[in-house]
């Protein structure tokens, strides 16, 4: 881990650390760009509070919607709704006036600012 508590090194790459509130306490998350099999954006969160990073959650859901692409994805408000407002306030997500239903849940489409996943000096 880097000496700066706001930066975490993983696989030779620097990631910005977001101290966020979960229902059970504080977590320190980094966000990583991945993709679904159809090539659309998937965002993984890893908890770096401990000695080793642990997979925390997939923050997006793949609804096979034509509005999804490499920049826009539906936020998983069903499992990670408590992070939605915090990431919005941090400027990581920008909600769009579109949502989609799956089962009993409605998911907002967001534009993800992937530049916020890395420290400012790495952009």
Residue ranges and their predicted role:
Residues 2, 122-123:
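Low-complexity, intrinsically disordered extramembrane tails and loops of integral membrane proteins
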Residues 2-5, 12:
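Elongated scaffolding segments in large macromolecular assemblies
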Residues 6-8, 67, 78, 115:
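Intrinsic disorder/low-complexity detector
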Residues 10-15, 19-24, 28-58, 66:
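Catalytic phosphate/metal-binding cores of nucleic-acid and nucleotide-processing enzymes, i.e., regions
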Residues 26, 67-69, 99, 118:
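A generic structural micro-environment signature
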Residues 44-92:
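Acidic, aromatic-enriched beta-alpha/helix-loop junctions
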Residues 76-122:
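Short, compact, well-ordered microdomains
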């Amino acid at each position: 881990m880097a000496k700066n508590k706001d930066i975490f090194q993983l696989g030779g790459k620097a990631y910005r650390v977001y101290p966020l509130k979960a229902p059970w306490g504080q977590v320190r998350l980094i966000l990583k760009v991945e993709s679904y099999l159809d090539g659309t954006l998937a965002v993984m969160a890893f908890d770096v509070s401990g000695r080793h990073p642990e997979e925390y959650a997939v923050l997006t859901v793949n609804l096979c919607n034509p509005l999804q692409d490499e920049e826009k994805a539906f936020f998983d408000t069903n499992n990670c709704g408590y992070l939605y407002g915090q990431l919005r306030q941090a400027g990581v997500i920008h909600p769009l006036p579109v949502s989609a239903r799956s089962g009993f849940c409605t998911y907002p489409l967001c534009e993800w600012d992937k530049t916020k996943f890395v420290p400012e000096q790495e952009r």
